[in-house]
Design a protein with these regions (language model features):
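Amphipathic alpha-helical dimer-interface segment in Rossmann-like NAD(P)H-dependent oxidoreductases
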Residues: 110, 144-162, 176
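Catalytic loop of short-chain dehydrogenase/reductase
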Residues: 169-191
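Conserved mid-core segment of classical short-chain dehydrogenase/reductases
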Residues: 68, 102, 125-139, 180-187
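Non-catalytic terminal and boundary segments that flank Rossmann-like NAD(P)-dependent oxidoreductase
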Residues: 1-29
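Catalytic Tyr-X3-Lys loop
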Residues: 116, 124, 131-150, 165, ...
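Conserved glycine-rich Rossmann-like NAD(P)H-binding loop of the short-chain dehydrogenase/reductase
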Residues: 52-73
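The beta1-alpha1 cofactor-binding region of Rossmann-like NAD(H)/NADP(H)-dependent oxidoreductases
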Residues: 91-103, 135
Length: 191
């Protein structure tokens, strides 16, 4: 059994990172949606730390009473982490809005010349009992999680396709979330 995983053990550095010592992200350009906070912000942070140019997008422009962070507070924190060779950009962008997506992509291309990857993290989730779920909530989740994610990914993919390279990472709820009785019982629509 030990020999089976020897290649993995050899690739793990002392800092427990599987990434190569010389970052393959240096100079690469990534766009991260839903990056005002949480998973999106932390992915953007790691990309910046590894030397990538990062454009973050999100809808939260003003402080929210229940949610931490704005696109501008995230930008400030990421700029403090970046080196002089990498750029960090931020745009308020609703991934359901083709005009805002085009502005984000065009400005990113204007500054960095290419898009090497996109992280599709923006989402909407309304956790209500299926019988309590409103049409408005279902429409919001469908328009963001399906239509918006598809539209934003498609537009970024067009530019990556021209470069004949690129990476796309789509964030989804954890699998174990779906295997609890409580999840299935109370949130059938969201599953």
């Amino acid at each position: 059994m030990k020999d089976k995983y020897a290649f993995v053990l050899k690739s793990i550095r002392k800092d427990m990172s599987l990434l190569p010592k010389k970052s393959y992200l240096n100079g690469k350009t990534y766009i991260v949606s839903g990056a005002s906070r949480g998973i999106g912000f932390n992915i953007a942070k790691k990309l910046v730390e590894k030397g990538a140019n990062v454009t973050i997008i999100g809808k939260t422009q003003n402080p929210h009473p229940k949610l931490e962070g704005t696109i501008y507070s995230a930008l400030e924190e990421l700029q403090n982490l970046s080196n002089e060779k990498s750029t960090v950009l931020a745009f308020p962008c609703d991934i359901r809005n083709p005009v805002e997506i085009d502005i984000t992509i065009n400005e990113t291309l204007k500054v960095n010349g290419k898009i090497d990857g996109v992280v599709l993290n923006a989402s909407a989730l309304c956790l209500n009992d299926t019988l309590q779920q409103t049409k408005k909530e279902v429409d919001l989740m469908s328009s963001v999680n399906i239509n918006g994610t598809y539209l934003f990914g498609q537009k970024c993919l067009q530019h990556m396709y021209k470069n004949k390279e690129g990476h796309m990472l789509m964030i989804a709820p954890p699998i174990d979330m779906l295997y609890t009785d409580d999840w299935w019982t109370n949130h059938k629509y969201n599953s």
